[in-house]
């Protein structure tokens, strides 16, 4: 799984060298942010059901037409699948926060997502709206510390930009 540390080590090994000073600075920065990332991961894990529900509700609130016949949320089963997908992505955000890299999102969430959603007639804009709502809803210090919020928002921005 890709993280800052595994990326640095892989690059150095591929080049047949030891990690450079800038490589080690990158690892050090990643380690310094670990506490904030773990705080964000813990807060997300302890509140994930509410986060997923609010994100899904925001998605269907903004794109109400999705519940029309022939659309992605035309029945309860399909609506539940949308919430399930949001939950899946939020777990991947959690995993990414824990490891300090985008590996889980890249490997298990984003690769091919646009093509799959297009094939299934699922608009990525609805998922983007759900993740943007979740990012914008964050309120420090109510939800988490400012630095943890930055780490959390950065992970959500990564999903949003990848699906855009």
Curated annotation (Swiss-Prot):
Amino-acid positions noted as binding (2R,3E)-phycoerythrobilin 1 in the UniProt annotation, renumbered to this chain: 81-82, 84, 88
Pfam family, one: Phycobilisome
Alphabetical keyword list: Antenna complex, Bile pigment, Chloroplast, Chromophore, Electron transport, Membrane, Photosynthesis, Phycobilisome, Plastid, Thylakoid, Transport
GO biological process: photosynthesis
Bilayer disposition of the protein: Peripheral membrane protein
Organism domain of life: Eukaryota
PTM text: Contains two covalently linked phycoerythrobilin chromophores.
Residues holding (2R,3E)-phycoerythrobilin 2: 47, 137, 139, 142
InterPro entries referenced in this protein's UniProt entry, alphabetically: Globin-like_sf (IPR009050), Phycobilisome_asu/bsu (IPR012128), Phycobilisome_asu/bsu_sf (IPR038719)
GO CC terms of this entry: chloroplast thylakoid membrane; phycobilisome
Subcellular localization, as worded in the UniProt entry: Plastid, Chloroplast thylakoid membrane
UniProt-listed SUPFAM superfamilies: Globin-like (SSF46458)
Further information: The light-harvesting antenna system in red algae and cyanobacteria is formed of phycobilisomes. These are composed of the phycobiliproteins phycoerythrin (CPE), phycocyanin (CPC) and allophycocyanin (APC). Cyanobacteria also contain phycoerythrocyanin (PCC). The phycobiliproteins all share the same subunit composition and organization with variations in the covalently bound open-chain tetrapyrrole chromophores.
Family: Belongs to the phycobiliprotein family.
Function, as annotated: Light-harvesting photosynthetic tetrapyrrole chromophore-protein from the phycobiliprotein complex.
Record note on quaternary structure: Heterododecamer of 6 alpha and 6 beta chains. The basic functional unit of phycobiliproteins is a ring-shaped hexamer formed from two back-to-back trimers contacting via the alpha chain subunits. The trimers are composed of alpha/beta subunit heterodimers arranged around a three-fold axis of symmetry. The phycoerythrins also contain a gamma subunit which is located in the center of the hexamer.
PANTHER family xrefs: C-PHYCOCYANIN ALPHA SUBUNIT, PHYCOBILISOME 32.1 KDA LINKER POLYPEPTIDE, PHYCOCYANIN-ASSOCIATED, ROD 2-RELATED
Record-given protein name: R-phycoerythrin alpha chain
Organism, as annotated: Agarophyton chilense
Origin organism lineage: Eukaryota, Rhodophyta, Florideophyceae, Rhodymeniophycidae, Gracilariales
């Amino acid at each position: 799984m890709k993280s800052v540390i595994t990326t640095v080590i892989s690059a150095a090994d591929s080049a047949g060298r030891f990690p450079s000073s800038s490589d080690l600075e990158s690892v050090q920065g990643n380690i310094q942010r670990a506490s904030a990332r773990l705080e964000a991961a813990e807060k997300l894990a302890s509140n994930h059901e509410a986060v997923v529900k609010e994100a899904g509700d925001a998605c269907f609130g903004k794109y109400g037409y999705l519940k029309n016949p022939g659309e992605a949320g035309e029945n309860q089963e399909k609506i539940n699948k949308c919430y399930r997908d949001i939950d899946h992505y939020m777990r991947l955000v959690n995993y990414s926060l824990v490891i300090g890299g985008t590996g889980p999102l890249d490997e298990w969430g984003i690769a091919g997502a646009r093509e799959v959603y297009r094939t299934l007639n699922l608009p990525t804009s609805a998922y983007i709206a759900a993740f943007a709502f979740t990012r914008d809803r964050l309120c420090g210090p109510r939800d988490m510390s400012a630095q943890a919020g930055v780490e959390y928002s950065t992970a959500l921005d990564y999903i949003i930009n990848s699906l855009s």
